[in-house]
Regions:
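Serine-hydrolase catalytic machinery in alpha/beta-hydrolase-like enzymes
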Residues: 6-96
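Short beta-strand/loop motif that positions the catalytic acidic residue
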Residues: 145-153, 157
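Short alpha-helix in the alpha/beta-hydrolase fold that links the catalytic acid
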Residues: 161-171
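Acidic catalytic loop of the alpha/beta-hydrolase fold
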Residues: 155-160, 190-191
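Alpha/beta-hydrolase fold nucleophile elbow
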Residues: 96-107
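Catalytic histidine neighborhood in serine/cysteine hydrolases
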Residues: 172-191
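Catalytic histidine-centered segment of alpha/beta-hydrolase-like enzymes
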Residues: 73, 188-200
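Gly/Ala-rich beta-loop-alpha elbow adjacent to hydrolase catalytic centers
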Residues: 106-114
Length: 219
């Protein structure tokens, strides 16, 4: 997984990149939790998402938002971070112009950014949102949700109560044929401290079971 840098709106962005052997492999971008609360691309859950995509044959990129690690710039309350995410997806897609499909994903704050990017990129086929902070941020932009995806939370999450996510999903309108799969891991806190393997297994299972269902990009 080589270290890479690419240009973002606030300067250089650092990332970790896994390249699949198949040039038509699907691609995925992974976004980390809140930069001001210790979130980085090396956060355990962020890495687990990245690893799950790689094991499923994706070319995948995780990166540090502006002001984190060696990424240039300063925290921008989600606005600049969304621009960073768009730049990351553009970079990855440029490496794989023949990709069979695009997925985006994130953990906590990163899932809020990922879902905003989903609304701006009709070429995204599916999403993974791990512990989206539904009670802390406005997710009303998600209605109607344009793509199918997977939402996961721990039932002991002290930051994102599962009830907040369940309320969000009930209120979220969906376009025709869009399905959002919801999974709750019993006993898990926000960081899945004792449930890392279960988290990884559920992510991998969802990805593998939906690979063929993601619409292929037109040539």
């Amino acid at each position: 997984m080589p270290d890479i840098t690419f240009n973002g709106p606030a300067g250089r962005i650092e990332g970790k990149y896994f390249q699949a052997k198949d040039p038509r492999a699907p691609i995925a971008v992974v976004m980390h939790p809140h930069p001001l609360h210790g979130g980085t691309m090396n956060t355990k859950v962020t890495y687990r998402i990245y690893e799950a995509f790689a094991k499923c044959g994706f070319s995948v990129l995780r990166f540090n938002f502006r002001g984190v690690g060696n990424s240039q710039g300063e925290y921008d309350n989600g606005v600049g971070e969304l621009s960073d995410a768009a730049a990351a997806l553009d970079w990855l897609h440029a490496q794989h112009p023949s990709t069979s499909g695009i997925w985006i994903s994130g953990f906590s704050f990163g899932s809020w950014i990922a879902l905003q990017l989903l609304m701006r990129r009709p070429d995204v086929a599916r999403f993974l949102a791990v512990s989206p902070p539904a009670g802390m941020y406005d997710f009303s932009f998600l209605s109607p949700c344009p793509a199918s995806g997977f939402v996961m939370v721990g039932d002991n999450d002290e930051i994102t109560p599962s009830s907040d996510i369940e309320d969000l999903l009930k209120k979220t309108a969906r376009q025709k044929d869009v399905k959002i799969h919801y999974s709750k891991i019993m006993g898990a806190d926000h960081f899945y401290t004792e449930q890392q393997e279960e988290l990884a297994n559920k992510l991998t299972q969802y990805i593998m079971s939906n690979l063929e269902k993601a619409p292929a990009l037109s040539a």
